[in-house]
A protein has these predicted regions:
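N-terminal/edge-of-domain interface segments
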Residues: 1-196
Length: 196
């Protein structure tokens, strides 16, 4: 008898930001997609089987696993908030490709010329790493890996991480600017409102 799945470590009280307009990479496959770029440009990707709970929590598109983009390869995209949030922490679900990688997220408020900016450095471990980077925990784990050329690697278990960075002081935020580093793949972003 299989053990029940481990609950996802979703950020308590976190407000999820909408990534849908910015998704530009398919990092989860439900079958071999030889022509796919995957997470590293060579086709390596999560096997979608076993990630259904994560897909639902992260709001993946209906056709995820079939080549539909499910994450954002960071190229400086701007995530607009529906309403301003006074944030006390930033949460990022994602992975790095090519080793542990850090990027600077910019929490902005105001117009482009007069905006107040709070920079938040987030480090994510590689999707094939066994251990998380600092300030991170395991978010989800696939049953196996689709390797270069669409080959199935059942001995490899790619992992998705959840990084949490508390701000030194609460910051008013109306938009979040992602880093410029396509080796960082973001599957989910949350802001935790300040409750003081």
């Amino acid at each position: 008898m299989n053990a029940p799945p481990t609950p996802l470590p979703l950020p308590a009280g976190g407000v999820a930001l909408d990534l849908a307009p910015h998704r530009n990479n398919a990092g989860c496959h439900s079958r071999s997609l030889i022509a796919a770029e995957g997470l590293d440009g060579f086709g390596r990707a999560f096997a979608a089987h076993g990630l259904q709970a994560a897909a639902a929590a992260l709001g993946f598109p209906e056709q995820w696993g079939e080549g539909e983009p499910d994450n954002v390869a960071c190229e400086g995209q701007t995530l607009e908030l529906a309403a301003p949030i006074k944030a006390s922490a930033l949460h990022v679900a994602g992975v790095a490709a090519g080793g542990s990688t850090a990027g600077v997220f910019r929490l902005c408020h105001g117009d482009a010329g007069t905006s107040a900016v709070t920079t938040v450095r987030v480090r994510l471990a590689d999707f094939l790493a066994r251990l998380p980077a600092e300030d991170s925990v395991l978010f989800a784990e696939a049953d196996f890996l689709y390797d270069i050329g669409g080959r199935t690697q059942r001995r490899a278990q790619p992992r998705m991480w959840l990084a949490t960075v508390s701000l030194p002081r609460p910051a008013l935020c109306t938009r979040v600017e992602l880093p410029v580093n396509p080796d960082l793949h973001v599957f989910g972003v949350w802001l935790r409102p300040d409750d003081t």
